[in-house]
């Protein structure tokens, strides 16, 4: 394996069509699933934890670009480069879908990392890769999939 060329992809929080809206992972899809079933959305803590969300098709394009690039032996962060708190995410969902829903705040969990967002400048530079699907459009696409 000596001399093997590689690239490592470090995705942020991917979401999108075909993600399980009935599970417990993937806050955006889980929130939309609960909204579609008219269930309360549960937030652990005060909703201030922040994450970097990336639509799945943008992630796939980044992976493909990393597989074919001449810039090898790199670690590429793949995300939007923007962090949204859970409260901000809920506001975005409400604004985009024009739907009201109930949120239930639960006691915080010690395992939740306060902030996760990635610097994707190396992927932008070496892979000529950029996010194409803004969060608002990604919410709509995911919602359309769940409603089918």
List each language-model region with its residue ranges.
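Generic structural signal for alpha-helix termini and adjacent loop/cap motifs
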Residues: 34, 38, 66-70, 126, ...
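Conserved C-terminal active-site "lid" loop/helix of NAD(P)H-dependent oxidoreductases
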Residues: 56, 75, 88, 109-130, ...
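Catalytic Tyr-x(3-8)-Lys segment
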Residues: 45-49, 127-131
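Short aromatic/basic micro-patch
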Residues: 8, 53, 83, 117, ...
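Conserved beta-loop-beta element that borders a ligand/cofactor-binding pocket
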Residues: 1-17
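Glycine/proline-rich active-site loop of Rossmann-fold NAD(P)-dependent oxidoreductases
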Residues: 14-30, 39-40, 44, 48, ...
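Amphipathic terminal alpha-helices
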Residues: 135-148
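Helix C-cap/helix->beta junction micro-motif
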Residues: 1-2, 37, 97
């Amino acid at each position: 394996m000596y001399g093997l060329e590689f690239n490592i992809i470090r995705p942020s929080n991917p979401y999108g069509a075909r993600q399980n809206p009935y599970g417990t992972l993937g806050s955006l899809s889980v929130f939309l699933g609960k909204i579609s079933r008219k269930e309360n959305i549960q937030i652990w803590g005060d909703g201030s934890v922040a994450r970097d969300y990336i639509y799945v098709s943008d992630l796939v394009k980044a992976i493909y670009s990393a597989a074919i690039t001449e810039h090898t032996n790199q670690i590429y962060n793949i995300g939007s480069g923007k962090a949204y708190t859970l409260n901000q995410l809920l506001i975005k969902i409400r604004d985009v879908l024009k739907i009201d829903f109930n949120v239930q705040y639960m006691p915080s969990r010690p395992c939740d990392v306060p902030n996760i967002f990635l610097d994707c400048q190396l992927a932008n530079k070496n892979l000529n890769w950029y996010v194409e699907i803004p969060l608002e459009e990604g919410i709509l696409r995911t919602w359309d999939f769940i409603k089918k």
